[in-house]
Amino acid sequence: MIISASTDYRAAAQRRLPPFLFHYIDGGAYGEHTLRRNTADLADIALRQRILKNMSDLSLETQLFGEKLAMPVVLAPVGLTGMYARRGEVQAARAAAQKGIPFTLSTVSVCPIEEVAPAIDRPMWFQLYVLKDRGFMRSALERAQAAGVKTLVFTVDMPTPGARYRDAHSGMSGPNAAARRMLQAVTHPQWAWDVGLNGKPHDLGNVSAYRGKPTTLEDYIGWLAANFDPSISWQDLAWIREFWKGPMIIKGILDPEDAKEAVRFGADGIVVSNHGGRQLDGVLSTAHALPAIADAVKGDITILADSGIRSGLDVVRMIALGADGVMLGRAFVYALAAAGEAGVVNLLNLIEKEMRVAMTLTGAKSIADITSDSLVQVTQRRLDGL
């Protein structure tokens, strides 16, 4: 299959993956309206073309939390990444390091902290959920610090799981799920050889290390469901802010008032995110939520954004809407599933090229030059009017 654009990797991943894995990463919550709006709303945003600018010294470099990045992109935390390619978290982390950007390890990764951190020559980021088991949370934080992690991404938009109806149809959950997954693996031999046989152990490394026993897919679903904590509040996070001495980012902000609370709480950054449309269907797309949040807290806190970003043009759009940087989730997992570490490197190369074209043709020599002036104002007024 020819890969000429960053968006080509989705089809390549679908060919290679068993359906239960493809639809797990590809799907969203309920009717998937927010999932679709995330990409559609970004695509609808018109960039403002400018000409005859001297763009010979264009640079994508930026800094986030004191860390130099080759471009304003971070690989987002994605659970079960190690099921999409052999030791997938390690491969993705190496690709990110090669391109000079951070990789964020999920709490529910296949590869544990202690396997991923030594594989790269720059500190990775670590993501943690709010869970009832505070002992696990503290243990994970201690292990992350011991592994040299400096930046913590704290996900707060999962006090309860969203209903992901696709999973029941695909075999991730539902009747006879284990048998359906086994049949799918047999009919996808490339994945079965690379990951199914040679990518073991297939458990959640970070969770298994704490529990002292392997954590299978069924164990993962049960353990995570039992540990969601709907009682969590800002006050409950105080001990984490005191414990964690490095940058702390709150992920899952969609409302300006919550963004202001994050500033008052003492967070160093936020991620404007609807969890890729995987939690509450019907909420605003990130592209529609971001401008009001940026108006409320820009300059007081570092703003990242995710959900719906598939190309370098989308990165430029998000920055023009008010983000300081973006996180890529599905996009890198598609590339990882299709072609491993090399696929993620190529994806990031494509995104970099797309950003350079967009910046050149909008007259932005640096990331700081990408502002609301980079957008056609009729588009901006439509966003502001929601």
Swiss-Prot record:
The keyword Ribonucleoprotein does not apply. It catalyses: (S)-lactate + A = pyruvate + AH2. One of its GO terms (cellular component) is plasma membrane. It holds the Pfam family FMN_dh. It is a peripheral membrane protein. GO terms for biological process: aerobic respiration; lactate metabolic process. Its main location: membrane. Its cofactor is FMN. CDD domains: alpha_hydroxyacid_oxid_FMN (cd02809). The active site is at 275 (proton acceptor). Keywords: Cell inner membrane, Cell membrane, Flavoprotein, FMN, Membrane, Oxidoreductase. It comes from the Bacteria. This is L-lactate dehydrogenase. The lineage of its organism: Bacteria, Pseudomonadati, Pseudomonadota, Gammaproteobacteria, Enterobacterales.
